[in-house]
């Protein structure tokens, strides 16, 4: 399994607008591509967000990056041409430990 993580560092004045966009439009549309099993959206501070996209295979991630990412990135840049910094990373899951119930 792969995690494709996108981190946004946003100017504080844009934070709520970016969060609304991500939760209300961007992430649901990406999920609808069928390339990811699960998507998780997190906030580290009022203006720092991380989205983790869980892909079952490299082929699924490649399909997203080739067939869908250019469109989504262009739309995002159109709506937010400035005021934020984006970083992207791909993580390969090595091992998962089960959580025990208390």
List the model feature ranges, each with a label:
Residues 14, 59-61, 96:
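Residue-level signal for secondary-structure boundary sites
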Residues 14-39:
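Short amphipathic alpha-helical segments
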Residues 31-37, 54-90:
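An amphipathic, aromatic/His-enriched active-site/gating alpha helix that lines ligand/cofactor pockets
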